[in-house]
Structures are given as C-alpha cells and as structure tokens.
Amino acid sequence: MAIQRVLCANDASCEQQSHSLLPDVLVSRRVDLASVIGWALEAKAAGVGHRPIAGQLGVPAATVRGWLRRAAATGGQVAVRLLKVAREADPAGRDPPGGGGIAMLVGTAAAAAQAWSGLSDEPVEVWRFAVAHTAGRLLG
C-alpha cells in the first residue's frame, strides 16, 4: 500500500514539513488493520489474555502484548479525545465508562461511534471511526 504525503502549509503551529495520509483502516506505526487491533482491545476489556487473543487472530503473542501494553498506557488519553468527539455529536451523552485505560478506550470508542451514527442513522464502524478521529493514533 502506498501512503501518500502532503506538504504542510507554512503554519507556525506545525512542526513537520509533511504529513502522511493514512486510510482509516490503519493505525499509525502498525501493520495490522484497525479492526484487528480493535478486536484485540475489546477481548482484553472482556478479560481475555494476550495469548488467547493472539491465537484467535493468528498474530504473534508479542505483537498483541505490545498493542495491549501501549493501549493500557495511553488508552485514557485517547478516550478523552474520543469523548470530546462524542460530545460534539451528542452534548447530552453519557459519562465515559469506568475501568482502566483499555476498558475506557473501548467503551468510549463505541459510545462516540454510536453518537455519530445517531446523527445520520447510518452505521459507523467503531475502529475506523476511532482511527479517523485520533489521526491514526489509536494506540497513542
């Protein structure tokens, strides 16, 4: 897959000269699809360990462990971003789900996608939506 780059306008707030344009099915700096990583996050939030998740996905356990560690460390921050997106769509939306970083990330991603889906009555795929609204930084 060829990743397109665009030149950044002369904006003082921009620290880079160009930016990669990732499709919403890819997570920044990851090879696997957002839906695969999202499934792993959902399974972990449900209490499944990294080895069974890896076996189900056919992905090395070390890869899944890396996703889960990264999500545990940054999930709260990513969830806050997604909560802001959810509130734009539904200001009266519910409070963010409790739990650790991964559980909070999974719950908030689902709530945000559902809130936006309600605006158009069109289905919104949770993990593509989350990737698009975190600029590809689903794992921070």
Feature-to-residue mapping (PLM):
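Cysteine-rich micro-motifs
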Residues: 1-15
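Short, positively charged, Gly/Tyr-enriched micro-motifs
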Residues: 11-99
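Long C-terminal interaction/binding lobes of large macromolecular proteins
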Residues: 77-140
